């Protein structure tokens, strides 16, 4: 049963690997170390960030969000994660949401994600969006 619950389609795994490569490449020059699948304890449940980039004064939490059917349910889960972690150390981390298949996200779902992430990136493919992801990470690093 746990295999079914934790199942991620191959496309999502490929996307996560591609984004991970982009984040790792950026982190080397920026002086960050990267952790994968970082678990954070919320008030009601545990949550997992796909990537967390850490340096001496910053933590940037990255979630790769797939829209499913219009994205609203996924956006609501992302919002719940933010609210559940709000009073924790992890709740103070800077948040980057990467939206896969950006054309499939409804306006309401996209707006909800933007309420909880400091930066949102539309991700079409690794070649065209590499610079956008790295620029967003850099902007979050520099933000006070």
What is each stretch, according to the model?
Residues 2-37, 144:
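Acidic-basic catalytic patches of nuclease active cores, encompassing PD-(D/E)XK
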Residues 45-48:
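A short, glycine/Asx- and small/polar-enriched loop/turn
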Residues 52-62:
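Active-site beta-strand-loop-beta-strand hairpin of nuclease catalytic cores
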Residues 68-81, 105-108:
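Active-site-adjacent loop/helix micro-motif of nuclease/hydrolase catalytic cores
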Residues 98-144:
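Domain-level recognition of nuclease-like catalytic cores that cleave nucleotide substrates
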């Amino acid at each position: 049963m746990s295999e079914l619950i934790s199942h991620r389609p191959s496309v999502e795994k490929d996307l996560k690997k591609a984004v991970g490569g982009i984040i790792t490449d950026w982190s080397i020059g920026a002086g960050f170390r990267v952790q994968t699948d970082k678990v954070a304890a919320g008030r009601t449940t545990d949550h997992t960030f796909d990537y967390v980039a850490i340096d001496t004064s910053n933590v940037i939490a990255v979630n790769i969000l797939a829209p499913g059917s219009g994205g609203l349910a996924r956006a609501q889960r992302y919002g719940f994660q933010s609210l559940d972690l709000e009073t924790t150390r992890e709740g103070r981390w800077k948040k980057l949401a990467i939206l896969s298949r950006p054309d499939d996200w409804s306006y309401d779902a996209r707006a909800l994600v933007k309420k909880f992430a400091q930066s949102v990136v539309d991700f079409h493919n690794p070649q065209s969006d590499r610079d956008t992801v790295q620029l967003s990470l850099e902007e979050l690093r520099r933000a006070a």
